[in-house]
C-alpha cells in the first residue's frame, strides 16, 4: 500500500466546519473596510527576493531566517511573500497608483514564514492588511486604529484586546536612539542572552522586543525612545493621542514597542490580548513614510497594518464562540419516498429564487426521517422542511422550527414567506 502523503508541517488544511467560521469573520472584516472606503488589491504570492530584502531589512529575523526563497529555472531568486506591505507598495509603484494620489487599499491571503509551528503561528498563515498612501497627518493613523476598533466590536471581542502605541520618530531620531541604546547594551553585555547579543550587533532596537524576563528588568534602566524624538514626530504622536482620546479609544503608550520590520517610522501600534498565551499580538502596524521612495517610487507618506487571521479566529472562537451561528444552514430539506427527490430539487430551487440569502441544504442521500433530522441538526439548521409522498402529492410541505419544536403544514407557495418570518 502506498504511503499517505501528509500536509507540510505548519501548513494546515481548513475543513468545511472551520471555513464556515472563517468566512463569517472575513465577511465582517470586509464589510467594515468597505464602510471606510477601502478597495481590495490582489497581489502575487511570489515576488522577487530583493523586494523583501530592501523593504523589510536584510538583518531582520524575517529575511535572515524565515523566508522561503528559491531560484527559478532562469536562476532568479524568488520568495514566497512573508508579509503584504512590500508587495502592495511594489504594485502601487508599478501601476502608477501612488504619486500625488490618495489610496486606501486592503488585501488578504496566505503568507509564508519558516518558523517553529505553534498555536496561532504557522509556516503558512493568512493575513489581512490595509494601507493608506498619500496622507501624512495623525488623523489617518487614527482612522486605521478606529477601523480596527470597529472590527473588534463587530466580532464581539472588544473587551479582550488592548491597544499599545509608540512613536519611533524620524530616521534621524532612530539613529540617535540606536547609538544610545547600543552604548547601554555594551555596558551590560554580560547580562544579555545569545539572541540579544546578536541583535545588539545587527538590529539593536529589536532587543526591546525580548521575552526574556531578566533582560526586560535590565531594560527598565535603558534609554527611552521618546526622549530622542524630533519635534515633528512628537507633535504627530501627540496629535494621534488626542484624536484617540476624543474618540474614546483607550490605549497604553509602550516605549519598548518598535515592531519587527525596518521600514517603520513615527507611529507604531499593536492590539494585544492575554487570551492566546505567548502569541499575544492580534494586529499591528504603523507609519512607513520612506518605503515607497526606498523601493523606487517618489516620496509618498504611508501608514498601514496587518493582522494574522489564524490568531483572530482563535480569539473569536475563545471569547465569542456563537459569533458564526449565522454561518450555519438556515433550513434543511428532509425528503423521503418514491419520486420525492425530483420534487425536492424543484422546491429547493424555487425557495432559493424567492429568498436569495437563504442557506438551504437538501438531503439527497436517502435515509430515514430520523437520520435526516440528525443531519439537519449536525449542520446547525434552524428549520426542517419535511417533504414526503403525501406532502408532494398535495403541493405542501411541513415547516418545523427546530429551536421551538413547533411545526405546521403549508402550501409550497407560502413557504418562502414563512421562512422569512421565522428567520427574521
Swiss-Prot record:
Molecular-function GO terms, alphabetical: ATP binding; histidine-tRNA ligase activity
EC category: ligase
Presence of keyword Transcription: no
Pfam families, per the entry: HGTP_anticodon (PF03129), tRNA-synt_His (PF13393)
EC number annotated for this UniProt entry: 6.1.1.21
Catalytic activity: tRNA(His) + L-histidine + ATP = L-histidyl-tRNA(His) + AMP + diphosphate + H(+)
Keywords: Aminoacyl-tRNA synthetase, ATP-binding, Cytoplasm, Ligase, Nucleotide-binding, Protein biosynthesis
PROSITE patterns, per the entry: AA_TRNA_LIGASE_II (PS50862)
A GO-annotated cellular component: cytoplasm
Localization terms from the record: Cytoplasm
Single biological process term from Gene Ontology: histidyl-tRNA aminoacylation
HAMAP family assigned: His_tRNA_synth
Subunit structure comment from the entry: Homodimer.
Sequence similarity: Belongs to the class-II aminoacyl-tRNA synthetase family.
Protein name, as recorded: Histidine--tRNA ligase
Gene that produces this protein: hisS
Amino acid at each position: 500500500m502506498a504511503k499517505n502523503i501528509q500536509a507540510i508541517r505548519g501548513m494546515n488544511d481548513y475543513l468545511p466546519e472551520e471555513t464556515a467560521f472563517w468566512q463569517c469573520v472575513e465577511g465582517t472584516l470586509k464589510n467594515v473596510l468597505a464602510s471606510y472606503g477601502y478597495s481590495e488589491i490582489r497581489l502575487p504570492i511570489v515576488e522577487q527576493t530583493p523586494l523583501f530584502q530592501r523593504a523589510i531589512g536584510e538583518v531582520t529575523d524575517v529575511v535572515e531566517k524565515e523566508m522561503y526563497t528559491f531560484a527559478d529555472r532562469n536562476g532568479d531568486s524568488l520568495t514566497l511573500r512573508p508579509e503584504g506591505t512590500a508587495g502592495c507598495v511594489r504594485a502601487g509603484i508599478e501601476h502608477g497608483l501612488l504619486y500625488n494620489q490618495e489610496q486606501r487599499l486592503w488585501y488578504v491571503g496566505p503568507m509564508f514564514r519558516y518558523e517553529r509551528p505553534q498555536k496561532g503561528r504557522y509556516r503558512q498563515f493568512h493575513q489581512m492588511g490595509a494601507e493608506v498612501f498619500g496622507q501624512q497627518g495623525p488623523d489617518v493613523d487614527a482612522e486605521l486604529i478606529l477601523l480596527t476598533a470597529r472590527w473588534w466590536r463587530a466580532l464581539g471581542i472588544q473587551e479582550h484586546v488592548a491597544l499599545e502605541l509608540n512613536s519611533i520618530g524620524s530616521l534621524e531620531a532612530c539613529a540617535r536612539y540606536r547609538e544610545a541604546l547600543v552604548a547601554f547594551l555594551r555596558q551590560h553585555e554580560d547580562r544579555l542572552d545569545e539572541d540579544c547579543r546578536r541583535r545588539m550587533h545587527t538590529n539593536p532596537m529589536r532587543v526591546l522586543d525580548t521575552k526574556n524576563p531578566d533582560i526586560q528588568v535590565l531594560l527598565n534602566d535603558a534609554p527611552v525612545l521618546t526622549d530622542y524624538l524630533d519635534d515633528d514626530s512628537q507633535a504627530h504622536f501627540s496629535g494621534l493621542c488626542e484624536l484617540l482620546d476624543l474618540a474614546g479609544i483607550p490605549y497604553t503608550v509602550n516605549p519598548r514597542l518598535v515592531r519587527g520590520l525596518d521600514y517603520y517610522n513615527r507611529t507604531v501600534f499593536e492590539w494585544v490580548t492575554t487570551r492566546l498565551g505567548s502569541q499575544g499580538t492580534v494586529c499591528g502596524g504603523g507609519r512607513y513614510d520612506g518605503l515607497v521612495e526606498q523601493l523606487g517610487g517618489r516620496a509618498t507618506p504611508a501608514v498601514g497594518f496587518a493582522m494574522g487571521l489564524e490568531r483572530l479566529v482563535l480569539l473569536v472562537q475563545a471569547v465569542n464562540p456563537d459569533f458564526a451561528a449565522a454561518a450555519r444552514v438556515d433550513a434543511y430539506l428532509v425528503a423521503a419516498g418514491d419520486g420525492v427527490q425530483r420534487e425536492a430539487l424543484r422546491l429547493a430551487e424555487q425557495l432559493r429564487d424567492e429568498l436569495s440569502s437563504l442557506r438551504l441544504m437538501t438531503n439527497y442521500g436517502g435515509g430515514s426521517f430520523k437520520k435526516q433530522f440528525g443531519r439537519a441538526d449536525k449542520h446547525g439548521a434552524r428549520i426542517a422542511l419535511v417533504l414526503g409522498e403525501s406532502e408532494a402529492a398535495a403541493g405542501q410541505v411541513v415547516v418545523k422550527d427546530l429551536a421551538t419544536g413547533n411545526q405546521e403544514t403549508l402550501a409550497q407557495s407560502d413557504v418562502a414567506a414563512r421562512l422569512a418570518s421565522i428567520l427574521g
